[in-house]
Amino acid sequence: MRPSQRELGTLVFLLIISVCVSMPAFAFENEPDGFRGIKWGTNISELPDMSLSEDYGNSKFYLRKGEKLKIGDADIDRIGYGFYKGLFYSVGIMYNGSLNFKKLKAIFVEQYGQAQQQKQFGEHYSWLGETVKIAVRYNEIAKSGDIWYVFKPLEKEQEKDDEQKAKKGAKDL
């Protein structure tokens, strides 16, 4: 017995709904186009107030001279700006203390909406956008945490480059 068009339509509708429900959200409120006035993809040569902190070849991390080490009334220990092949693609923010974590989490929820909570050691909240992903983490044992912004297009380029390096390296075996 063949299903009717109505039954097929219902089946297709249910399949579409189940796929949509199971897919992670790819947008969040106020997805940032940069951080503290620096747009994603900006060339490091355009930012004279940056000083090199860590050099990993194509990935380099900089500190900004005169950086404001506060977000709202939360105290920040350090903000590092990541560049891949000279282009701005990530921010790493380090902080200490549960009080700062609570303040920062509230600020990020206010700015970006409800987060996805990850089941990991400590607390981990994330926002996954079309072009940016953000993670706020806190380790209760170490009493410290970090926040990461990552510009996904340059992250994908970095992953492809790393994959090519691994393939080349595998030939040495």
Regions found by a protein language model. Give the residues of each.
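Non-cytosolic coordination micro-motifs
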Residues: 3-5, 27-65, 92-173
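Bacterial N-terminal signal peptides
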Residues: 11-22
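Extracytoplasmic
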Residues: 35, 74-78, 86-88, 122
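A general beta-strand register signal
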Residues: 70, 83, 126-128
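Hydrophobic/aromatic beta-strand elements that line small-molecule binding cavities or substrate pockets
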Residues: 77-82, 136-138
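A short, structured loop/turn motif at beta-sheet edges
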Residues: 83-85, 113
